[in-house]
Amino acid sequence: SQLIMIVTLFSIWMSLAWALVILCSSVHFWMKRSDFNVDTSPLEHYPMVTVVVPAHNEDVVIAQTTKAILDLDYPHDRVEVLLFADNCSDDTYQEMLKVQAMPEYAGRNITITDRTGTGGKAGVLNDALKMAKGEYICVYDADAMPEKNALYFLVKKVLEDPERHVASFGRNKTRNSNQNFLTRCINQEIVVTQRVYHVGMWHLFKIGRIPGTNFLINTEFVKSIGGWKNGALTEDTEISFKIMQSGKLIALAYNSEAFQQEPETLKSYYMQRKRWAKGNYEVVLANFKHLFSGGNWRVKLEVFNYSCIFFWFNLAIVLSDLVFFANVAAMITQLFVPDVRIPFAFDAQNIYIVQLMLFNWLLMILLYLLQINIALASQFGQATTKQIWLALVSYLTYSQLFIVVSLDAVGSVILDKILKRKETKWVKTKRFAG
């Protein structure tokens, strides 16, 4: 039991130290960019860009998304739009046609495909890769609402170093953040991920990750690495590792922003996050060999980072919870049965280990609150007193769901391997109008 406690405590302290390093990196990044002057001066040249929108039963939101893309502040003659209604049973295809027929979009380069192929989102992207005429491919999900300069900033970033920056990615913001308690918590999570974690990793290690939406990638480069993996649950993570393995960079275009809808029901949220967790597990396991090979150091760091987050640190938190509650239960039982021993303690007659676990929890809560408050402070209009109280409540509720989702996803991955199951269909997140 002492070994379990030592390993658990060491693991938690390591995770806290790592999180603090990334947090400090992000703070340094934002301190250097604390002014509000945004440079949108004309580019030396505007490469042709193919914007791809994969959509599966998205008739509620696809019209808004299509209009937002067609209204982007980028030369219209340098934009090709490919819309895919993939195996839809609703009016997604018809909604796309309605937008295309609007007078204000007459003459625009729009191709609409009523697709019946396989492979999910990755399959759509591979079909688009064969059709694309642009030097770069930009991807937006069907619920995305890019701001007018989103594409401009993505292109500007890759043009800073076209040889190394084969891709760029922006930030995503929650469209429906005030809908309910769940969406408010998701909003805080996304703000921390985008404003702290992604920024910190890029600033310190020049490591970027392809998100599911609002990213740009060199067309010929994608072809050279074999495109997207059909059926991948997280095609974005999978191709990110391919890019890093090639020695190229996925550059952060922090001024490129797009709004996206988040799940508004617990069931929808759970299924989405389980799919993401499963996909990330599969990618990590597939790339684990690079830890011990002569591959790119960024790949090694990312594999180690993912392994720690999804396996080591997650297990440590579960063990710490078990140790804490087992000890508390034993202490309560001692009030009635004095001979009961505390199961996890360096000295069976003291409660130091319980106090240490409480101290660990306090450290984790403080760091959690610090991350959220710094992230919110870096985004206009987000840092409020309500957000602080929400962060505290979400730590005790929403953030604990990550453990449940992770354990469920691990079990599902193991069963997939045993039963040789393959999940290649779309997993639909319910959309809402507005």
Which residues does each predicted region cover?
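Juxtamembrane C-terminal module of membrane proteins
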Residues: 22-46, 289-303, 330-434
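Catalytic donor-sugar/metal-binding loop of nucleotide-sugar-dependent glycosyltransferases
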Residues: 231, 240-259
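Long helical/loop segments within the catalytic core of UDP-sugar-dependent glycosyltransferases
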Residues: 100, 104-107, 113-135, 148-233, ...
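N-terminal signal-anchor transmembrane helix
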Residues: 23-78
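Cell-envelope/extracellular polymer assembly enzymes that use nucleotide-activated donors
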Residues: 47-50, 80, 223, 238
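A conserved acidic beta->alpha catalytic loop
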Residues: 76, 85-94, 117-118
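Acidic helix N-cap motif at the loop->helix transition within catalytic regions
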Residues: 63, 90-99, 149
